[in-house]
Structure formats: structure tokens, C-alpha cells
Design a protein with these regions (language model features):
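His/Glu-rich zincin catalytic helix
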Residues: 1-82, 189-295, 334, 420-426
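Charge-rich, well-structured scaffold segments of protease-associated domains
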Residues: 1-6, 26, 81-232, 267, ...
């Protein structure tokens, strides 16, 4: 080997990316299990997913509260005992409630799987929702809300979603002191009984599994029809966006910083323009070298960071441009955002910039597939949205092959300043 000669540089777009296929098993009671095996490290990730997000709420906050309190006590274990069991084995048991789904995720060493699965089973199948835990949850969440409501960026995030989707839509509905006060144990138990059932459960496993992993899963989750059977119909909920487009809110009259949000509705991931828009959004504001960062951060110095993102909601998406800037330059920041929108409409993206973004996006995907935990997350995202590997590969081809002319047409269609909601919170 001649070490005076550097190895050839290979662009990310030249890599032939393959999404490692999963193995699928079915427990005795019908629960599907999706598996990505890896023996690189003696660690395991086990995630249970339920259709128990805010989309299915009849009362505000019941999805998040139910999900949180399931880990805070069962008929056999107190919250302290659950946490001590997990911590003693160096593991993590996390729970999250999103718009559509709710999850429980266990990370542990492979050798501790058999000891920890009974704890997870207890949390999923036998939560007791203690009154004192609900009271503590309300108190803590109200304190957090009171603190966050003093922050302009938190307030801006709440309002922009309300403007885009409406006060009563799950994507636009926000927490409140009254909503926390209204939470009742009976309501949470009813939500739990309806949504956390065996036939609504899907299991995703990644990492180095013990040899008897499937037998263990079957023992704890597959032998009975726990919590009964519940047939859920995903309701169609109307979106009611605000009629006005421009808003200025003074949350703190003496504030020196403002939170800027510029956003518009956009079709969801099933629309053919969505993969193309991911490329345009990256050029515009999706990475550190974007148009917005180069102009508003590097050139003008108005902010430490400005980004544009595409929401990945199931019903409808949105384009959201967000930053925090000095109070006296918020309006100037908005003007520069619109200038960059119009620049993409009027001038094709130079080939050098497009090639750079292609390599950045493909490189990011390569990084996202580094390891079994990352691969199962990619598959989970596809499976939960009724998509397959063709969607993944089509997106890669879009990144590699989209032209500057196509991007310019997208900008003309979706980057019209008059279509955007505009919000400043100081």
C-alpha cells in the first residue's frame, strides 16, 4: 500500500443504498413482530406501538396522560419499584405519545431481557393509574406549562399549529391549565382499555436478541387476548385553518427576542410532490449550508440559526420556517425569507449547489441506516404509514435524479409568499 497516494473520493450519491429487510413473526394471539437482528453489540431495543395518540382523544390531553401514567404504578409494582427494576439493570423504559401513535420502548443489555420483560408486561397490561400519581402529574405539567408560556419560541409553536390546523384539530390543539385540571382517572382508564389492547399492538425488535426471544415475547404478550379486543376506526377530522395570515403577539412587552414562524399547509407524504419537496426544502432551509442560513445567519447576522422543515403528519403536512431573532430585526428577517422564496422561483438552482445537497441528503440517509436500531426505526416509519420499501427507494431516486427545472416549478407552486401564515411572538 502506497500511503503517499490518497484513496479515491467517492460521492455519497454513488453508493448503492440497501435497506436491510426485516423478519416478521406472529405471536400466538396474532400480534405482529418485526425484527432486525444484529450481533455487533449485546444490546436490545424492544418497542410496542399502539394507535393511542392524540388523534383518538375524546378529551384533551388524555392520550399523553394515559401513556405517561401507565408506567407510574400497577397492581403489583409502584412507580418507584418499576423505575428501580429498570435502573438496576442499566436499562431504559421510555414512553411517548404522538399525534397518531403511542409507544413504550425498552433498551437493555441482551442478558437482562428475560428479567425486564415481566416489568414491561406489567406496565402494558396492568396499570393501576393511582390517584396520587395523577395529582402529581397534573401539578408537574402545570408548572412546566407556566414556565414554558414565558418563552416566545414555545408560544410561537403553539400558535402556528393552531393557525394551520385549527383549535380543535389534534395537530393544532394545545395544552392548557384547565385541560390538565379536567383529567380524571376514570377517563384515562377508559382510554387505556380501548386503545392498549392486544389486537392494536405491534412490536418492533432490533439488536442482539437472546436465542429464546420469540418464546419470551409469546410468553409475556402472545398467550392471551389481554385487555380484550377493540376495533378502532381512525376518524376523519376536518382542518379549519385561520382566515387571517399575519399575526404579531406580544407575550413579553420587555422581551428583546422574537420567535418568527412562517408556515403553510402542504400535502402529506403520500403525495407525489412530497419526496421532491424534501430536496427543495433542504436547499432552502434544511441543513446548515442552506439558503436561509447563508443569508440570514451568515450574511445578515440576524439569528444564530434558521431552518425550514416539512411536517410528517399522516393527514396533512406543512412547511414551517422557524427562527428566533432580535426584536428589532424580526421584520427584516421575514423580508429576507420571502426574498429567498422568490429567488428559488425565479432562478434555477445551480448544478454545484444541487450536487452538494444530493450528497448531503444521501449521506444523511447512510448515517440513518448505521446500525440495527436505526434500520428498525426506518422500517417502523414505513410500516405504520402503510408504506413499503419501494417508497424508500423511490425517495432515493428522486434525490439523485431531480432537476433544477423541476425544483423551480415546485417553488413556483408552493413558495408563494401569500400562501404562508406569518407569526412573530415577542
Amino acid at each position: 500500500m502506497n500511503r503517499t497516494i490518497p484513496p479515491p473520493i467517492k460521492d455519497a450519491v454513488e453508493f448503492d443504498i440497501k435497506l436491510k429487510p426485516y423478519e416478521k413473526f406472529t405471536l400466538d394471539n396474532g400480534i405482529p413482530v418485526y425484527v432486525i437482528k444484529s450481533e455487533e453489540q449485546d444490546t436490545l431495543q424492544l418497542e410496542l406501538v399502539f394507535p393511542a395518540g392524540s388523534w383518538y382523544e375524546s378529551e384533551s390531553l388524555e392520550a399523553a396522560a394515559t401513556n405517561f401514567l401507565m408506567k407510574n404504578g400497577t397492581s403489583k409494582r409502584t412507580a418507584l419499584e418499576i423505575n428501580e427494576s429498570v435502573d438496576y439493570h442499566g436499562a431504559y423504559l421510555n414512553r411517548n405519545a404522538y399525534h397518531e401513535n403511542a409507544t413504550f420502548t425498552l433498551h437493555c443489555l441482551t442478558k437482562h431481557t428475560e428479567v425486564l420483560l415481566p416489568v414491561l408486561q406489567d406496565v402494558i397490561q396492568d396499570p393501576s393509574f393511582p390517584e396520587e400519581e395523577l395529582a402529581l402529574y397534573k401539578q408537574n405539567q402545570k408548572q412546566k406549562l407556566a414556565v414554558n408560556l414565558q418563552k416566545c419560541d414555545f408560544v410561537a409553536n403553539r400558535f402556528i399549529d393552531k393557525y394551520l390546523f385549527g383549535d380543535f384539530h389534534p395537530y393544532g390543539r394545545v395544552s392548557s391549565m384547565m385541560a390538565y385540571d379536567a383529567l380524571q382517572t376514570e377517563t384515562l382508564r377508559a382510554f387505556y382499555q380501548k386503545h392498549y389492547t392486544y389486537n392494536n399492538c405491534r412490536i418492533f425488535v432490533a439488536g442482539n436478541m437472546p436465542a429464546n426471544m420469540l418464546a419470551l415475547l409469546n410468553k409475556h404478550f402472545g398467550t392471551t387476548r389481554w385487555n380484550g379486543e377493540s376495533s378502532l376506526i381512525r376518524p376523519e377530522l376536518p382542518i379549519q385553518p385561520a382566515e387571517e395570515k399575519k399575526f404579531r403577539i406580544f407575550n413579553d412587552e420587555n422581551g428583546v427576542q422574537g420567535a418568527v414562524r412562517i408556515a403553510r399547509p402542504f400535502p402529506n407524504r403520500y403525495h407525489p410532490d412530497f419526496p421532491k419537496m424534501l430536496v427543495l426544502n433542504t436547499i432552502f432551509g434544511g441543513y446548515f449550508g442552506s439558503r436561509l442560513m447563508s443569508n440570514i445567519r451568515e450574511d445578515k447576522g440576524y439569528t444564530y440559526g434558521i431552518y425550514s422543515q416539512l411536517y410528517n403528519f399522516r393527514q396533512v403536512s406543512a412547511i414551517n420556517i422557524q427562527t428566533e431573532a432580535g426584536r428589532d430585526v424580526c421584520e427584516a428577517t421575514i423580508e429576507e425569507v420571502y426574498k429567498e422564496l422568490q429567488q428559488l422561483q425565479n432562478v434555477p438552482v445551480p448544478q454545484e449547489e444541487l450536487d452538494l445537497v444530493r450528497n448531503y441528503m444521501i449521506g444523511s440517509i447512510l448515517g440513518d441506516l448505521d446500525g440495527a436500531f436505526q434500520v428498525i426505526q426506518r422500517w417502523k416509519n414505513l410500516i405504520l404509514n402503510d408504506l413499503d420499501e419501494n417508497y424508500f427507494y423511490n425517495n432515493i431516486q428522486t434525490i439523485k435524479n431531480i432537476t433544477a427545472e423541476e425544483l423551480q416549478q415546485l417553488a413556483k407552486q408552493y413558495y408563494n409568499p401569500g400562501d404562508f401564515y406569518e407569526l412573530v411572538v415577542i
